[in-house]
Amino acid sequence: MNILEPIKQTRLYGLGNYLNELTKLYRDRKYPNKILLSGQKGIGKSTLAFHFINYVLTINEDHKYDPQNYIINIESPEFKTIQNKSNSNLIIIDTHDDKISININQIRELISNLNKSSFNQKPRFVLIDNIEFLNISSINALLKILEEPNEN
């Protein structure tokens, strides 16, 4: 069985109710600036996050996300740049292949990027996968930006 990584999952299974709640918050302009998804590894938290991000970033595009069927439009330029990890509105933080923790330099780079203006008027997202691997220095630096977010 071939398992795709969450960033490449174009269809969302079993988490539609959660996505509906997130998209409703977004449409009603009541979504928070921080969302924590918690649960066992492998249940689809990252996949859900990528689907929500695709929904938001393609809402005014020709190749929109399909919220009725929970399908990402593979023709979407946003999807392609997200899949290639080159989307300017998405920053992904995770452990590097050779590391067992998310280090302070990754968080410093995140903070530096968040202090810069966006290239477009679309929302920006930060996805921290495996947040339990943050070391103490990383946690403290991240808490500062979470407690005192800038206007970007």
Tell me what each language-model feature is.
Residues 1-137:
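Clamp-loader machinery-focused feature within the broader ASCE/P-loop NTPase space
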Residues 115, 140-152:
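Conserved catalytic/switch belt of AAA+ P-loop NTPases
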